[in-house]
Swiss-Prot record:
This is Gem-associated protein 7. It is found in: Nucleus, Nucleoplasm; Nucleus, Gem; Cytoplasm. PANTHER family: GEM-ASSOCIATED PROTEIN 7 (PTHR14679:SF1). GO terms for molecular function: RNA binding. Residues 1-29 form the SUZ-C domain. It comes from Bos taurus. The modification Phosphothreonine is found at T3. Belongs to the gemin-7 family.
Amino acid sequence: MQTPLATPVPVLRLPRGPDGSNRGFAPDGRRAPPKPEVPEPPESRESWEQQARASLRERYLRSLLAMVGRPVCFTLHEGVQVIAHFGATDLDVANFYVSQLQTPIGIQAEALLRCSDIISYTFKP
């Protein structure tokens, strides 16, 4: 038994665009809705601070991503410096998972560094 043929679907043909490749329409064409001239409200101090915090957080998260698999020098309290290969961080960025941690008293194969103990870190991208 044969299967019935599918019902043909009508095709809607759009008018040609402003360039020869039929891509898009001219923004000043008769079909474009007029855009109202609305002045932007002045940014408040709070929105400026929020943008600054968002920018700093994005830079911090990008630096964490760039550190993965690289040797990183961590400066801890009391001026202690340790070097380790950065692996990952937990979801709330409270701990760093590192490997080959070189401390003043020896090398640890794997370790967790609490972010509250870290003063700064440096690495070469």
